[in-house]
Amino acid sequence: MARLAAFDMDGTLLMPDHHLGEKTLSTLARLRERDITLTFATGRHALEMQHILGALSLDAYLITGNGTRVHSLEGELLHRDDLPADVAELVLYQQWDTRASMHIFNDDGWFTGKEIPALLQAFVYSGFRYQIIDVKKMPLGRVTKICFCGGHDDLTRLQIQLYEALGERAHLCFSATDCLEVLPVGCNKGAALTVLTQHLGLSLRDCMAFGDAMNDREMLGSVGSGFIMGNAMPQLRAELPHLPVIGHCRNQAVSHYLTHWLDYPHLPYSPE
């Protein structure tokens, strides 16, 4: 029996309209009744996730910013990882050949250089939003991550440019087909979950995890039971071909699997 369940949010626990379904909320409550520790592991900001947990009265640990922050049930900061100032400076000031928009994150929030209303659709659940600033004036020592949002082909070309400029000084990953992230070296959800399990006196073998994108790769590959969403990025399936694939987030597939796991643990599971 797993003792901790870690969930990605977008494309996994959240439905396509960016809400948590009633079946999902009910299943999370059942897990807590079984004393299974809940952990939300997401690229979203800690401020937003703390608001969501409060609104839903959920007790859960938080891995946010794709592993840049880990918070306890009480909101205590357990782990932090920031981009080196020289890396942040290079990414912010360099002229990249891309049409993608740039977004900067620190403990105070989400910052970008211009209004992009379409991006706010993903935050209807919480009301979290960006702040408009001159990105050249961002404090370089406080940046947790930088991400670029745009078309996938454009971002793939940008990824090559970033690799050439940064080398091994940053970790690059796609958190969605339309979002490329620049993170501290060694920073990912799997590394953050390792920190959390050590804090809790657990091992990664005691954990199950669910995800759909390349920013979930390390987490899914390191836990005792990793599950890939039916709507996952093809690259993730290719990287972890041995992991089982469940259903689509639009059908609350995580809840569907966990209900079977709780009620019929000894029977084989089918996502249909």
Swiss-Prot record:
The keyword Oxidoreductase does not apply. One of its GO terms (molecular function) is magnesium ion binding. The keyword Amino-acid biosynthesis does not apply. Pfam families: Hydrolase_3. PROSITE patterns: COF_1 (PS01228), COF_2 (PS01229). It is an enzyme of class 3 (hydrolase). SUPFAM superfamilies: HAD-like. It catalyses: 4-amino-2-methyl-5-(diphosphooxymethyl)pyrimidine + H2O = 4-amino-2-methyl-5-(phosphooxymethyl)pyrimidine + phosphate + H(+). Mg(2+) binds at residues 8, 10, 212. Gene3D superfamilies: 3.30.1240.10, HAD superfamily/HAD-like (3.40.50.1000). Its cofactor is Mg(2+). The active site is at residue 8. PANTHER family: HMP-PP PHOSPHATASE, PTHR47267. Catalyzes the hydrolysis of 4-amino-2-methyl-5-hydroxymethylpyrimidine pyrophosphate (HMP-PP) to 4-amino-2-methyl-5-hydroxymethylpyrimidine phosphate (HMP-P). HAMAP family: HMP_PP_phosphat. This is HMP-PP phosphatase.
